[in-house]
Amino acid sequence: MLRALKTHAEAPIVVATRAASTNAEKLEEIRERLAKGPNFHDFVQNPDNTRNEWEQYDGKLRREKGEEQRLRLPPWLKTTIPVGKNYAKIKAQMRELKLSTVCEEARCPNIGECWGGGEHGTQTATIMLMGDTCTRGCRFCSVKTARKPPPLDVNEPVNTATAIASWGLDYIVLTSVDRDDLPDGGSEHIAETVREIKARNSNIFVECLVPDFRGNLECVKTIANSGLDVYAHNIETVEKLTPYVRDRRAHYRQTLQVLTEAKRFNPNLITKSSIMLGLGETDEEIENTLKDLREAGVDCVTLGQYMQPTNKHLKVIEYVTPEKFKHWEERGNELGFLYTASGPLVRSSYKAGEFFITSILENRKKRQNDTEVPKKQ
């Protein structure tokens, strides 16, 4: 009886050992297949995302009135995950110097390309000044909000200039949160940052994407005369949708006034604005917005697809096709903008150093230098 129990007890052990051996072999086989197969980056990169796939896409691109379900992301809006040494270097330095970027805070889809350098190897980063918390609550933006954000970092202008100087960039974009809690909206802080950057490298082109300062023209003047090259302020959407999309303190006509006055304070500035598409605007409204910007003297305009950052933000009404964006690029150029950047993934500061603005500024500088050279007797 005891012998029988022993034999009976040993049998499962043999079976269990064989099962464990089989499982180990399967696990090793899976590991080998994973090592030889595509990695996570390959999966996200989606190499099949070709123009043919764009043209053949027959998914729904517009939500009808009353529909709650979100639209599926079309193939032309899928981007690669951010990787690479350049990306890691910039991110590490941002943390070390306690700097914020709109690239991260606004969850920009182009962060990997801009920080990594893209196919041309030019790095572009958009520094967000005055912290990562905004006093406004626009319904399209994922930046944190509060009525009274933390105090300004007095070392930020120097830290920002130090970082930018070490990168060796030709073009830098400075943006900021709104700081309605400050008497001057932070305009002097931004201007000081520009001066620090220019003191270290007078050849670098500086673009400032700034708030409306609640229409305070003294603040606009402070920025316009700080030494920057490009004054940018975004109109964001068409006039009809402005109260629905932007914070209640932001006004369509106020934005146009800010852009107009910036040019009046400094006629040598290039002025720039941006429009998001896909929020329910009509073609006629887009056309009128472009005309309003031109009448305000705006030189450059960008048009890009609105993408819902979280479930708490405005839903996308329509995914605009690349062909439609091409139409608006052509229309913008017809209206007389010096440069029109229009595409699904275009953002106000997207690859700023590679845009036409750089060549405009370089040509202006060359003409200025030529006129300053004394003629030979």
From Swiss-Prot:
Cofactor info, note text: Binds 2 [4Fe-4S] clusters per subunit. One cluster is coordinated with 3 cysteines and an exchangeable S-adenosyl-L-methionine.
Pathway assigned to this chain's UniProt record: Protein modification; protein lipoylation via endogenous pathway; protein N(6)-(lipoyl)lysine from octanoyl-[acyl-carrier-protein]: step 2/2
The reaction(s) this protein catalyses: [[Fe-S] cluster scaffold protein carrying a second [4Fe-4S](2+) cluster] + N(6)-octanoyl-L-lysyl-[protein] + 2 oxidized [2Fe-2S]-[ferredoxin] + 2 S-adenosyl-L-methionine + 4 H(+) = [[Fe-S] cluster scaffold protein] + N(6)-[(R)-dihydrolipoyl]-L-lysyl-[protein] + 4 Fe(3+) + 2 hydrogen sulfide + 2 5'-deoxyadenosine + 2 L-methionine + 2 reduced [2Fe-2S]-[ferredoxin]
Gene Ontology terms: cellular component: mitochondrion
Residues bound to [4Fe-4S] cluster 2: C134, C138, C141
Cellular localization per UniProt: Mitochondrion
Enzyme class: transferase
SMART domains recorded: Elp3
Binding sites annotated in the UniProt record for [4Fe-4S] cluster 1: C103, C108, C114, S349
InterPro entries according to UniProt: Aldolase_TIM, Elp3/MiaA/NifB-like_rSAM, LIAS_N, Lipoyl_synth, rSAM
A Pfam match: Radical_SAM
Lineage top rank: taxon: Eukaryota
Entry EC number(s): 2.8.1.8
GO molecular function: 4 iron, 4 sulfur cluster binding; lipoate synthase activity; metal ion binding
Keywords, alphabetical: 4Fe-4S, Iron, Iron-sulfur, Metal-binding, Mitochondrion, S-adenosyl-L-methionine, Transferase
Cofactor(s) listed: [4Fe-4S] cluster
One of the GO biological process terms: lipoate biosynthetic process
Radical SAM core domain ranges (all copies): 119-338
Family as reported in the entry's similarity comment: Belongs to the radical SAM superfamily. Lipoyl synthase family.
Note: This protein may be expected to contain an N-terminal transit peptide but none has been predicted.
Protein name: Lipoyl synthase, mitochondrial
Organism: Drosophila melanogaster (Fruit fly)
Gene: Las
